[in-house]
Amino acid sequence: MVFSEEQKAAIYYKDGPALVLAGPGSGKTTVIINRIERLIRMHNIEPSSILVITFTKAAAISMKQRFLSLVGDSYVSVTFGTFHAVFFNMLRQAYNYSAGSIITADTQYSFIRDAAISFELE
């Protein structure tokens, strides 16, 4: 694949986290997976220290599949996930939380409703 100068800059950047913003179909996923591959192979970055966060579960799964098809199964320790999944895993590991420990949407709504009613009465 031929990359633009902007894409090359993102792929070759190695000094810390990178935020890749671009429109649909612009090659973001390809750039990200090529950057990860380069970090591991050229800069000896430990795969388990790489975290890739996306907005949707489908995007995370797709990106991981595309990454593994590029590099093979030798780098399965790279973490791909959504914001929610990544932060839930942090809570689970740090505090032994389970899915039942997380407040439900109904409870959230009730709490906010009760707080709003209380605020209006005072």
Where are these regions (language model features)?
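P-loop NTPase Walker
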Residues: 1-98
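ATP-hydrolysis module of ASCE/P-loop NTPase motor domains
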Residues: 14, 75-77, 96-122
